[in-house]
Swiss-Prot record:
InterPro entries: G1P_dehydrogenase_arc, G1PDH, Glycerol_DH. It holds the Pfam family Fe-ADH_2. NAD(+) binds at G101, K102, S103, I104, D105, T123, A124, A125, S126, S132. The lineage of its organism: Archaea, Thermoproteota, Thermoprotei, Desulfurococcales, Desulfurococcaceae. The keyword Oxidoreductase applies. Its main location: cytoplasm. Keywords: Cytoplasm, Lipid biosynthesis, Lipid metabolism, Metal-binding, NAD, NADP, Oxidoreductase, Phospholipid biosynthesis, Phospholipid metabolism, Zinc. Homodimer. Its EC number is 1.1.1.261. This is Glycerol-1-phosphate dehydrogenase [NAD(P)+].
Length: 355
């Protein structure tokens, strides 16, 4: 029987993907009825401001917008709350997150708290936060995502994103590979715990993973067409979360493992690199032979597949595996409610060649 409860879905109004389009942002805003009667705030970073933020600022000012700029060095909750207060004082209504994950997460949070319009302008394709209604803020009581607002629009300049370090693109692919286990975990929670499961959102998330698997060689070549595939897949994954109303289709046991690593070895590796490594191991736990194929693809792309390559001691990886289930106790996954024993974790890293 169909679930008759009310399920509200908020999707981005527009997704614009092209090359050399940052200076056209005012035109796009105008088409969305976001005229220069609204004050705009650009949330960016010191480096990304010089690369992209400055272009957006000048284009906005040339079109009569009053613009304030925030150059944040981190995405801690204290920084986020400070930006919330300052943007409120300035009467900001259009929040442009220009940069990587930190800038976009801060802009989403500020827009959410101020009931504004959030415009996602990624300069890298390193994870699916560019389109999701969640933000990853450090310093909160839990190392998981915070609900925010769905981006009102996503404006992705492929030319700009192509100039980002290749490692960031690879990280984006790693985040997408994680959907393979995230959806399995969601299905498991549905069967064992009666949790809501949305087939459409699940299939959309899986499609984003399958898309990068299919075109992994093109992506590895650094071709702009490959970059575009990663960007589109990351946006699809973000939209899957919007449809589900949670991060379930995009975040499962592989993300719990990554969050555990964030606690034990902060800043050692990129989010997508950690997620991809977790995906290999979680697929193995499911008895899915696909883990070998995923590992081969990761090697081809240049993603780390061992503890040595990711730069984290194997003892830390084992510890992360044993505490991952505690990160988000209400999120049921293949790790179960009691998690892995240390012995089981060591066996897992040996069997999958992480050690």
């Amino acid at each position: 029987m169909l679930n008759r409860s009310i399920h509200e879905i908020t999707l981005p109004l527009k997704v614009i993907i092209g090359s050399n389009i940052l200076d056209k942002i005012p035109d796009y805003l105008l088409k969305m009825k976001l005229t220069n009667q609204y004050k705009a705030g650009i949330i960016t970073g010191p480096t990304t401001y010089n690369v992209a933020g400055k272009i957006v600022e000048e284009a906005m000012k040339n079109n009569g917008y009053i613009v304030e700029v925030w150059k944040a060095r981190d995405a801690r909750i204290e920084t986020a709350n400070q930006i919330v207060e300052e943007t409120k004082k300035h009467g900001i209504k259009i929040f442009l997150g220009v940069g990587g994950g930190k800038s976009i997460d801060l802009a989403k949070y500020a827009a959410y708290k101020n009931n504004g319009y959030m415009i996602s302008v990624p300069t890298a394709a390193s994870h699916d936060g560019i389109a999701s209604p969640f933000a990853s803020l450090k310093g909160t009581s839990k190392p998981t995502s915070t609900p925010t607002t769905t981006p009102y629009a996503i404006i992705a300049d492929i030319d700009m994103i192509s100039k980002a370090p290749p490692r960031l693109i690879r990280s984006g692919v790693g985040d997408l590979l994680g959907k393979l286990t995230a959806v399995k975990d969601w299905q498991l929670a549905h069967r064992l715990k009666g949790e809501y499961y949305g087939e459409y959102a699940a299939q959309l998330a899986l499609l984003s993973a399958k898309h990068v698997i299919r075109y992994h060689e093109l992506i590895a070549s650094g071709n702009p067409d490959g970059i575009r595939i990663v960007v589109e897949a990351l946006i699809s994954s973000g939209v899957a979360m919007c449809i589900a109303g949670s991060s379930r289709p995009a975040s499962g046991s592989e993300h719990l493992f990554s969050h555990a690593l964030d606690l034990l070895a902060p800043g050692k590796a990129l989010h997508g690199e950690q997620v991809a490594l977790g995906t290999i191991m979680m697929l193995y736990l499911y008895g899915d032979p696909k883990w070998k194929k995923i590992k081969r693809i990761m090697k081809k792309i240049g993603l780390p597949t061992t503890a040595e390559e990711i730069g984290i001691p194997i003892e830390t990886i084992v510890k992360a595996l044993t505490i991952a289930h505690k990160i988000r106790p209400n999120r049921y996954t293949i790790l179960g409610e009691k998690g892995l024993t240390e012995e089981a974790a060591w066996r897992l890293v040996r069997e999958t060649g992480i050690i």
